[in-house]
Amino acid sequence: LMMSNRPPDPKNARNKNVLVVGGSGSGKTRFFIKPNLLQCDSKNFPVSFVVTDPKGSIGVECGEALLKHGYKLKFFNTINFSKSMRYNPMAYIHSEKDVLKLVTALMTNTKGEGQGGDPFWDKAERLLLVSLIAYLHYEAPVEEQNFATLLEMLNTMQVSEDDETYQNPVDLLFEDLGKKKPKSFAVRQYKLYKLAAGKTAKSILISCGARLAPFDIQEVRDATMYDELELDKLGDRKTALFLIMSDTDSTFNFLISMIYTQLFNLLCDKADDQYGGKLPVHVRCLIDECANIGQIPQLEKLVATIRSREISACLVLQTRSQLKAIYKDNADTIVGNMDSQIFLGGSEPTTLKDLAEALGKETIDSYNNSDTRGNSPSYGTNYQKLGHELMSRDELAVLDGGKCILQLRGVRPFMSDKYDLTQHPNYKYTSDYDPKNALDIEKFLNRKEKIHPDDTFVMVDADSLPPA
């Protein structure tokens, strides 16, 4: 991919969004993700990376190479939260619309206990969650603005089915706030939720509790207590954020989706508000196992608009049908905004069918010779031009393991050798070259952080904290 987003020749002007499709073992990590990560030494076009890292191997193998080129490394680990930096989704709320975006991302990728798919329950849950999170953001101390406090509020919201005048502690909080700030966004949303009768309100609370159940695990509470990822600074300085997730258990993958949702929105807003529409450092998202992280809300709109802000998304899938399963009718819109598409090999029928059609046909010359023998022998030659698939589905299914097919917008598809990672100048810094280069993530996280002049800190009075 070219580094510049605005080449002088318009025919070369393409976005950096990439769709990579390859079956298991086709080399998606070795032949695409690692070579792109090692392109970290450009001085004229600095790049930050956000990498979905199944099993946590990519950060271990390439971390030292990034450190040598001045990168700040961040790790969020949903396999082992004790070996992770902290991520607090509420730390990135700056306005009422941010509250709505956070709740949308949460509800899109988690399940409540609503009844029969009735949209009423989702809407009611949304009202309650928006009101509680808005209350925490605008009224609670910074150290209490997290999901642990949100769960504590839910746990105190007892409902009486018989006594409509009964008030739980949270009702009293909002009643008091309503007297002080009657036009508060949190109060207005909570009043709408309180229109529900006692039995209905109890069902809403049960559904919210089920949706937030993962945050009740102590490890998750600790991991989301405060924030260290600094998602809003990815476009300010060279940073590599590794999102480590399990490729066999999707329980906590919704956190990864929430990170991507907030990341795209934060960076787009920052580019528009502070940098005149263009981030100083390009942010490239290498989303491996894209189908397993859940749905990123409005992705079809984001991939169409992030290019101008110096952001790009590289979606890595095993099959195209995975994208359709998650994004339904919007999958075609997403693919349409990927100016580069790479096929590394595979045998899934839908993928092969779509690719064979995209490759088109070639013209072949057909010669038919006839030779009739007998009393009146005759000879004839018939010539015609025919259309033939450039590569049929069965040919694509047995594609050489060392080859790939690349489609660039404005250029005919072509077959190429997969990139030899060992030829990259920065390969010598990886643990693939020398096991001594392996990054010990746990040791890295426990090191003493150096303080930089532009770092900001939040001062908290220890005496004001609630008892553990």
Features from the language model and the residues they span:
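P-loop NTPase motor domains
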Residues: 2-311, 326, 394-418, 422-468
